[in-house]
Amino acid sequence: MRVLNRLLQRLVILGLGIFSVWLIVFVVFDTAAQRLPWILAEGLTYGNAAYLILPRVIRMGLKLLHRKRVPSFTTTGDGLPGDPVNVALVGTLAQLRAAFAALGWSEADRLGLASSWGMIRAFVFNSPYPTAPFSTLYLFGRGQDVGFQKAIDNSPRKRHHIRFWSLSLVRAEETWAGGSANFWLNTDRPPDDERVLWVGAGTRDTGLSLTHLTFQVTHATDSDTNVERDFIIAELENIGSIEAVKVYQAGQCLATERVNHYTTDGRVTLASLVVDGR
């Protein structure tokens, strides 16, 4: 029965793929090509395919596959896999900010029209923008609470960066008893002055690229996120901002004071912030 269900799921996914190709090529492009110059028709087709059709088709496919396991990655606004979760720090928001400020990292601006335009200009002209905004990724049902970055060679095209989502230590302990899914589906953001678990996703941007599934314009990212995780932790260790550093393998229970359990499908480095956040 399970084999039959998987076969049916894959047939439906195949059907969605064929349908999306037909829609893009024979409906969107053919219609646009009849009414617009070729270059405009190509641009319109790309925009519809990358930002409207493919994200929705992929999201439907993910729902059909019942991706209900505890994620080891964040998700984009379209529900696609984003950056992997690879860091967990315990402390207050002030401590988190102080630790990364001591490294010379800058806190990212909130994403908006002004900051997005500033990022576009900086990217095109390769001019410094140390507080450039991040695209929004989702974990615990919300976008990142805070993010930090450090430009490489003073370029906005290449940078170390990490997003963080806060989770109350008390809330984490309570939700675990009800099952691992509840841990990740929790959407409550704790107060800024509370000592919390900061779940982070750190990656290194290497230039300009297109997303693999929808071909949207984005930063190219180094595929080896373990290197970036280890780099961030080593930097924090070198300045004495963290202690009790441990690396947890997939499926292991992670304990830190009031948090009894924390599981992941990938390796997550856990540490406690000890920097003075005042």
List the predicted regions and their residue ranges.
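Amphipathic alpha-helical segments
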Residues: 91-111
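Membrane-proximal, solvent-exposed terminal domains/tails of membrane-associated proteins
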Residues: 81-82, 87-90, 150-278
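Functional cores of ribonucleases/endoribonucleases
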Residues: 132-155, 161
